[in-house]
Amino acid sequence: MKRRTTKFNYFDAFASQAELAAKEAELLMLVVENFDRAEKLQEYLPEAHRIENEADEVHHSIHDALLPDFVPPLDREDITSIASSLDEVVDLIEELILSFYMYDVRFMHTDAIEFAKILHKSCIALCGAVKEFPRARKSVPFKAGVVEVNDLEEEADRLLSLIHI
């Protein structure tokens, strides 16, 4: 049986997932800012799918490493939950971009640009927090990142409530 010579770094993998979420959010921002017709979205779909596939590969690598890992740095359930949650961010953003095309969207609400910007800022803040995750207990930037993500979520909720009025 071949032994692994290097220990898998789950924290680096989480950081990669967060960076891919930020890339997908940046693409969403580009899609929304440059939207004029659904047909034009076809040019963005391959890149959205490429990013999502890359995120899936990282997600799978985490699970592949976790199975034989005798003593992972966190509880197995926590690693699985974190990896799945970060992957879900990328999946949902890709799904949103694809939905614009699939539902043949003809009009983009003016607040959609602001909403996409908030989502992108949230993913950037998530990246910062995830990079500090190994030092979470003593890290001021980690705590600040978590607060920033929560603040941006509240900002997005306020914007969404205004749109629905």
Residues covered by each model-derived region:
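Extended, positively charged loop/linker patches that create polyanion-binding surfaces
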Residues: 103-138, 142
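Hydrophobic/aromatic-rich structural module bridging two neighboring secondary-structure elements via a short loop
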Residues: 41-51, 61-91
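Disorder-to-helix initiation segments
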Residues: 1-17, 71, 75-79
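Amphipathic, charged alpha-helical scaffolds that flank and support histidine-based chemistry
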Residues: 38, 73, 97-106, 113
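A structural signal for well-ordered alpha-helices, especially hydrophobic packing surfaces
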Residues: 18, 22-32, 52, 59, ...
